[in-house]
């Protein structure tokens, strides 16, 4: 009942709080992420054609995972998917789709039956979020809720969520640790990430 594996992936911002490449490696080699036996785990990566997403897909493919990319190409290009194939010698399955599209996401999950989702998809510009708060709340929060609903309906209980250092607002201290207070965000983008952390935590404990 609900999603039982939730991880927050803190991404690098202008202050360089976290190293993105090391995050990709830690995701790839995390103990327990592979299936038993010889069958490769299938991982669906939302926003997989973006910068962080595409680098993560390279690491996953090179580690032997099956990768399915879902990206609406709002801030990415299908050329990134081609480049992933060139780098790894393996072609990931790609769907141009929006995570808010319930019917399309249901179709993808029914066909692919992923074991795990790594969730990068979402609007991500701090300044733009101040000008377009409705778009950010609708895209990031409603999109993730739709994704979680489709996951539940298809028996996929593992999600790794890409959060952001913006959840700390103006941090109480630097360098930031997990003990740093959260929830005093300074922009709508940060609030979407903070709210989603809470939503996923609630789903985890349901």
Where on the chain are the PLM-derived regions?
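Short, Lys/Arg-enriched N-terminal segments with co-localized hydrophobic residues
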Residues: 20-40
């Amino acid at each position: 009942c609900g999603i039982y594996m939730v991880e927050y992936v803190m991404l690098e911002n202008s202050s360089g709080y976290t190293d993105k490449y090391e995050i990709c490696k830690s995701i790839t080699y995390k103990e327990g992420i592979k299936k038993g036996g010889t069958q490769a785990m299938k991982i669906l990566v939302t926003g997989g054609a973006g910068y962080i997403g595409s680098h993560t897909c390279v690491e996953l493919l090179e580690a032997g995972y099956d990768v399915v990319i879902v990206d609406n190409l709002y801030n990415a290009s299908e050329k990134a998917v081609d480049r992933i194939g060139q780098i790894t010698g393996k072609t990931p399955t790609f769907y141009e789709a929006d995570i808010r599209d319930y019917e399309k996401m249901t179709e993808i999950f029914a066909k692919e039956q992923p074991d795990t989702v790594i969730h990068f998809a979402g609007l991500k510009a701090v300044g733009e979020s101040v000008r377009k708060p409705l778009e950010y709340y609708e895209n990031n929060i409603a999109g993730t809720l739709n994704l979680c609903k489709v996951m539940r309906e298809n028996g996929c209980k593992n999600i790794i969520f890409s959060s952001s250092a913006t959840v700390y607002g103006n941090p109480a201290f630097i360098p930031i640790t997990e003990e740093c207070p959260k929830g005093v965000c300074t922009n709508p983008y940060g609030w979407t990430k903070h709210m989603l952390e809470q939503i996923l935590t609630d789903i985890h404990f349901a």
